[in-house]
Amino acid sequence: MALSFVDFISQAMAQPSLFVILILVIGVTAVSGATDAPNAIATVVSTRCLKPSVAIGLAAVFNFVGLVGMTYISTAVAKTMFGMVDFSGNTDAALYALMAAMIGAILWGIFCWFFGIPCSKSHSLIAGVTGGAIALNGLAGVVPAEWAKVIYGMAFSLVAGFFLGWLFVKVIEKACTHVNRQAANHAFTGIQDVCAVALSFLHGAQDGQKFMSIAMLGVALSFGNPTPDSNGFPMWLMIICSLAISLGTIVGGKRIIKSVGMDMVKLEKYQGVAANFSTTFTLLFASLTGMPVSTGHCNTSAIMGVGASKSFKRVNWGIARNMVLAWVLTFPACGLIGFLLAHLFMMFA
């Protein structure tokens, strides 16, 4: 949909709820930057390759680049987001239901950020949108074939992240058996810096498409079309969302870095490289195949796999358990909030 910013403002004047949806998209995107984007740089900080302030600045820049850049490479994730729910029906009711879904995701994200829980904004968004769609159209509001990609993504990121983290550690240890430790650590520092850039790029690519998809869904609904054009996004929307995710990263980064990179398992530099390789591969594959996944989910699984490669006792399973609990709670919590708020809002449609 070729939509200029002037066209958007004109449409929002006719449908004020559309402007509210854009504000909510910006809010959710910023919360994602605060709670999920720091996962991309957790290992590079925990292994002391970069200072937290430098790493957070790097993440902010390349989240911006990734969000804009991936739009020109692949929009597979956006197509999944567009296709997994059905908001067809009364235009005003659909827009109100979409607003409720966004508010549910924001409330849950703020709760998790306040308590230092690295929850997934991806899962929050998907759950909230699903709850809103069900409130609007019942179970017919969910498209099982597309929604299944969410389940595939969760399973893939957990299994692939853990296994590849374990595997890459073994490969690196074998390859560096006779390498001078000081020289190896110097090389691993540089590699981790590159990985931090790649992971920040991929986080922006994954989450950017999810959030921009909701904004474009709102635009499409305001025109009476339940299915947006997934071939691209207007530049003004990409710039707004990329700035939001970068600002969120700068504001909220340190709290999540501590939970993921420092408290769960103590990493050496080569182990940080292994975790980053694992997360990079997992995110890239998911982005190209249209599976919406969480950077935090992928990174946490990779770190646990790396820690388990030495000994299962090296992993702080209490931290890991709390994270898994947060993931498990996100779908029913955000889904229910989105569902209830949608019913409440639609009373005024």
Task: Show the residue positions of the predicted features.
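Multi-pass alpha-helical transmembrane bundle typical of ion/small-solute transporters
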Residues: 2-349
